[in-house]
Amino acid sequence: VQTCALPICLAEPMLLMSVLDNLYSNAVHYGTESGTIYIRSNNNGSRVFIDVANTGSPIPDDEKTMIFEPFFQGSHQRKGAVKGSGLGLSIARDCIRRMQGELNIVSDERADVCFRIELPLEPEKSMK
C-alpha cells in the first residue's frame, strides 16, 4: 500500500463512499478471480482524481460509450455472476456530477478497466 498526502476534497462523504463502493463492487464482479484491483488518488492542484481499476476483464470498446446509460449491462460478466440492474454506473455518475465532478472510463496501462472520479478541490457552487 502506498499513500501520499492529498488536499481535502470538498465532497459529500456518504455520496462519495457510495460511489466508491459501487465501483469497487463492479471491479470484483466483472474482474477475474486472478485479477488485481487498484484504488489510486492524485491531484493537479485544482482537482482530485480517484481511480478504481482492475485487471483481467477489459470492457469491449463498443460498450464503453454506453456504460453509463441507465439499464445498460455489460457483456463481460464473470461466468456465474449475478446480474445487476444496470443502474449502478448511471447513478454513480449522477452523484459525482452533483458534486461538480465527473466520472469517466479512462485508459490505464496498468489495468484493463479504469474508472476515474474527478472532483474539484473547492466547490464551484453549492449542491442543489
Language-model regions, residue ranges each:
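Short, small-residue-biased leader/transition segments that mark boundaries at the very start
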Residues: 1-6
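Conserved micro-motifs of the catalytic ATP-binding
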Residues: 8-11
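Short helix-loop "hinge" at the ATP-lid/N-box region of the Bergerat-fold HATPase_c
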Residues: 27-28
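Short alpha-helical Gxxx[C/S/T] motif in the catalytic ATP-binding
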Residues: 88, 92
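Short conserved segment of the HATPase_c
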Residues: 59-71
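Short beta-strand/loop element within the Bergerat-fold HATPase_c
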Residues: 34-46
